[in-house]
Structures are given as C-alpha cells and as structure tokens.
C-alpha cells in the first residue's frame, strides 16, 4: 500500500518511475510523482532500481530510477491462477484478490504472447485523532485544533497487461507491451473538530460528513487510471544493432461530485485534559456539547468536480556497434511530447429554506461512536448526517438551493505542454581482464508552454494567463568503473549528473493574491531543473 517510492533517501519527486523502460505520466495535479500502488504486484515480473544513471537512461532521476518490468512471453505454455481473501478489522468486511496469467508460443516459436489480469477489492478504513498544539504568551502549551476522524474506504483495483513478440529471423524481431490499470477509491469520512480551541477551553464545534452521489455509492470516488502501450523492434543493420520503440501513455484522476456538509456550533466550553500528551481528551462542560443537534447551524455545503489528465507520446531509437574486440559504442535519441491539464470546478450551496433543511438533515443521522476506536475507546466520534442523505440532495434544483462558484478553488487550474528532446553517446570498454569502464554524455532539451490562472481575493475573479514559454538544456555526463580482482569480489565507482524538473505548481504562470493575509503566490515558468552531482562507491564480496 506504499504510495510513493524513495531512492537514496531523497524525496519521491527526485526519482523516476517507468514501466518497461518508459516513464509513466503522473495522475497527481501539482507534482510529477507516480503512485506505485496503482499497479498490483502480481502484474510485475521484475523491479529494476538504478542509482548510477548511464547516458542511455532518462536524466531526470536524482535519487534513481525505478523500472517495473511486466511479464514477458514465456518459452512454453504457462497458466497461473491466484485467489486470496482476508478480513479487515475496521470495515468488518472480507477482502478479495484474483489473478490470472496465460501465455504460449506458436508458429515454430516465432510468435509469443503473455496476458495477465488482476482484480482486488479491499474494504478498509481507519480511526484517527489529530491535534495541533500552540503556546500562549506565558509559554504554556495547549491544543488549538482537536479532531476525531473515521474513514471508511473501499479500494478496488483492476489491471490488465499484454505482451506480444514475433521473431522474423535471428536479426529481426518486433514486440508490443501494454498495461492498463484502474483504481477506484470510495471514501467516506466523519470528522468532529474543535476549531480555534483556546487555552481557556473555548472552541467552535464543527461536524462534517464527506460523501458523494448515489451512482458513486454515496462516497467520494477517486478514480485513477494509467495506461502505457509501446511498440518496439530489434533489428540488425550491418555492423549496427538497432532498437526502436514508439509509445503512448496516459494517466488520469477523476473526482466527480465530491460533497461535504459541515455544521457549526459556536463558543462551546471544554475541560481539556492534556496529562497524556499522546491521548489528550476534551470533555464538554455542563450545558455545552459537541454532539450534532438542532443547536447547530449549517456552516457549508459544497460540491467539487476534479479532472486531471497527463498524456505522453514517445519515440526512441538506439544504435549499437562494436569497437574492436573489447569495446562497444551505443548512441541514440529520444523525443517525448507531454500534455497535462488540471480542471477543478467548485460550488457552495445554500438551502433557500435553511430551517426546513436543518430539520430534514437531523432526521437522517447516524451514530459513528465505536467501541473499537483504535487510538482509544474514550474518543466518541458522535452523530453525523448520513452519507445517503448527502448523496440524495438535488443540488442543481434552483427551487431548493442557490449556488455560488468559489473562484479561489479554481486558481490552481492550468494547461501545460512539455517537449523533451534527448540525444546521447555511451562507450563500454574492458580496459583489462579485471577493469571495465562505461561512460558518456547525454543532452536533454526541455521546451515548455504553460497557461495558468490569476486569482484576486479582492475582486473574487479568476482569469487565464497568457501562454508562457521557456526552454533549457542540460548536459549530463556519467561514468562507471568496475573492478573484479577475483570471482568473489567486485568494486564499482560511479559518477553521474542528473536533474529533477520542477513540480507543475511551481512553474505554472499563475498568481494567487490574498490581500487579507498579505500573501501572494506566483508561479515561475522560467525555473530550470534542479541539478545534482552523484558519486557512488559499491563493494560486494561473496
């Protein structure tokens, strides 16, 4: 269930993730990170991790590169089926896992295929307490924000992969690899918050339900998809070996009809026991409450639509030839055309008959108090408006609700285009019987075109920026020495220069002006990539 991979202990954005050697686009909105939990483990044959990058590898991986290799065509008929189950303590529901792999070779072993499918359904959840601590003027600590949360999540994964290859003769081969992954997360969250809790124990109580529409199980649906399709070939052209490939990849994230309903009761008083700092407890004083009732008022009712897509079109050519008996030269070029779009639409709704709406909402509540609450059973999450009620609301009925678009939520929308053109040369030579050297140079040119948004909280307006263009070039040398004085000892010494391109939110030419907070956030499309000099020494003794 780990989400992002880390190499060398660097942040995830400093490493790259690829499938069969091709970078995967990111379904995240503001960053380039790829969620590894999108791809089930049973779809992967091998995981390759490279820390010292060679010139024939993409240069944007300071920490290193993680390459997920899908299953290749087998040498003979293969059939494998997997089924599994489990039980989740929080959701009190069973989990299911199914997998099927089949492959064979035909036409005198010239044609091979391997097809795999995987399905996982995992109802899960979590119990959560969160506290924000502050100090008063006398240096005394107190809790400023106090939250009790319950999550119920059903994660469903579907994954399909296909590998084909056809060998014309010993010098010519063509292959295809494709993978499609779909992950649906249906999430409901029930949260009680003591907002702005003072050192004297006074706070506003907020009670919130996170839900969705009936067609999405009355839950917030997050649907992430990735797909990668690559056609390649291996050919012998005289003294040259030619490898080529052309591919298309796409990643997307959809969050349709994500709804929140939030109620508030102002200025309640609490006795806050912080003698146990890991499990502080706030108890309402007599006459005060943190349980949803008709004393509360509607704070907000919102709905959000989110659509994020990233697409890559890729071409690569590699040529290799021998330079004498103990050396070879490899060189090639690669082109990637990337487009990315982030679109969010956000509305606040106000019931025209707020008193009648409150009565109806309070008639559709559910008690989430749970003796199995893992942090401690002393925390009582309380009563919430049910997810079914939130999902059933016809928010577009103008006779029931008025609506207002929230411009601040649209400020992060953008459209981006990146074109990366790369060329490299790599020499591999054996200096002696015990020493091998690999080294070369990679050149990458990055051209950008971005359109963002400008938001001003004084006028409550959002407008598109003019397209901003920029480009930069990186020269990335690398070398690796390998010394093998005997069969049981190997010493490697490597150096390479690599980069990490800025996250999207940093280079989109947007502007977010918050005059009330005296803050302004500005994207800088002229930002260049972060560069790094990497040195590696590795010794192995068997």
Where are these regions (language model features)?
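Extracytoplasmic beta-strand/coil segments of soluble accessory domains associated
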Residues: 1-23
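Transmembrane beta-strands of outer-membrane beta-barrel pores
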Residues: 85-89, 119-123, 180-184, 237, ...
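Short acidic/polar hinge/loop motifs at secondary-structure boundaries
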Residues: 23-51
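Transmembrane beta-barrel wall of Gram-negative outer-membrane proteins
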Residues: 92-194, 224-231, 235-238, 477-479
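Flexible glycine-rich, low-complexity coil/linker segments exposed to the extracellular/periplasmic environment
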Residues: 271-300, 354-412
